[in-house]
């Protein structure tokens, strides 16, 4: 969710070719674990496999000592990378795209995928037995910050279903993230998009009803990815491989375990959230194939992502970034 005009400039230039070293075996060799400063864009169940990698000890087993911080914004997370206050960040691909197009000498290539598409749900105030997208016409809808990926993906979903988001609906995009649920409960808007666990909790409370998955509607377009500076990756390829291996293990575990077990694994990161909402959210994301089961990122998914940015007028078509520039595929290809 990064505005390209706010990309932080700076960092060190990196040169030379990337060479992937042998798998990282710090623990096996008795070496102290490598400390990783990890920044996630926001706290969300959408990133459950990453939390599972921590609670299940996959990072630890890979010889990584992970320190997690929540940036509260893609611009802040990528700024942490560029200022060398974070080593690895979980952000949307738009961050890497905007940095690539900026004057910053340091770039932030993607090396591992986590989510296959958008994780927001379209919800209604009243129960609708047979939803049709045309029902949104003329209605007030609680959206998201202008230019952010949640609203861009929602607009793309509407366009796919014959709705002009600029003319056919009234999008209320000026509600701050912490105030969105409260605004809905106060009776504002007839429809809304919510991420988990808010969507499931509102359903459990009878305050909203599920209509459609934005991500399922839009299709594969890797929504959140791991990235680091080109210099960090060049200097620490074994660490990047170890990270990718740990995420792959977590992806396979998340895909195979009961929703209740996934909810239990991520519960420490969602203090105070109803366990039933966590389990319902986990089951929904898995059913909708929102979580990737591999760290590999496909060119078509990145093309689709950039299509959405172009349609939303936050990326000039002439400034699309080539897949081979945007994504380093060698780490995901070797993940085990």
What are these regions (language model features)?
Residues 1-15:
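N-terminal secretory signal peptides and thylakoid transit peptides that target proteins
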């Amino acid at each position: 969710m990064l505005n390209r005009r706010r990309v932080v400039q700076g960092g060190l230039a990196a040169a030379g070719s990337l060479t992937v070293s042998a798998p990282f075996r710090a623990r096996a060799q008795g070496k102290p674990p490598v400390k990783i400063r990890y920044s996630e864009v926001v706290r969300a169940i959408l990133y459950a496999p990453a939390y599972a990698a921590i609670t299940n000890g996959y990072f630890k087993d890979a010889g990584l000592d992970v320190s997690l911080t929540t940036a509260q914004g893609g611009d802040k997370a990528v700024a942490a990378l560029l200022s060398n206050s974070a080593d690895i960040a979980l952000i949307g691909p738009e961050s890497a795209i905007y940095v690539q197009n900026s004057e910053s000498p340091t770039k932030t290539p993607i090396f591992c995928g986590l989510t296959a598409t958008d994780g927001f749900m379209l919800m209604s105030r009243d129960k609708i037995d047979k939803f049709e997208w045309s029902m949104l016409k003329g209605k007030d809808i609680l959206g998201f910050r202008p230019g952010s990926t949640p609203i861009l993906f929602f607009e793309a979903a509407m366009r796919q279903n014959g709705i002009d988001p600029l003319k056919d609906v009234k999008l209320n995009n000026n509600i701050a993230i912490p105030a969105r649920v409260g605004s809905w409960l106060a009776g504002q808007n007839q429809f809304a998009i919510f991420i988990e666990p808010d969507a499931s909790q509102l359903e459990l409370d009878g305050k909203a009803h599920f209509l459609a998955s934005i991500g399922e509607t839009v299709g594969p377009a890797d929504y959140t990815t791991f990235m680091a500076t080109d210099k960090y990756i060049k200097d620490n390829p074994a660490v990047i491989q170890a990270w990718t291996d740990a995420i792959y293990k977590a992806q396979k575990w998340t895909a195979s375990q009961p929703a209740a077990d996934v909810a239990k694994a991520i519960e420490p990161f969602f203090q105070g959230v109803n366990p039933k909402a966590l389990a319902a959210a986990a089951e929904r994301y898995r059913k909708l194939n929102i979580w990737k089961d591999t760290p590999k990122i496909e060119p078509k998914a990145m093309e689709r992502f950039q299509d959405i940015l172009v349609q939303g007028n936050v990326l000039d078509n002439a400034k699309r970034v080539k897949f081979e520039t945007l994504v380093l595929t060698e780490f995901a290809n070797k993940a085990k």
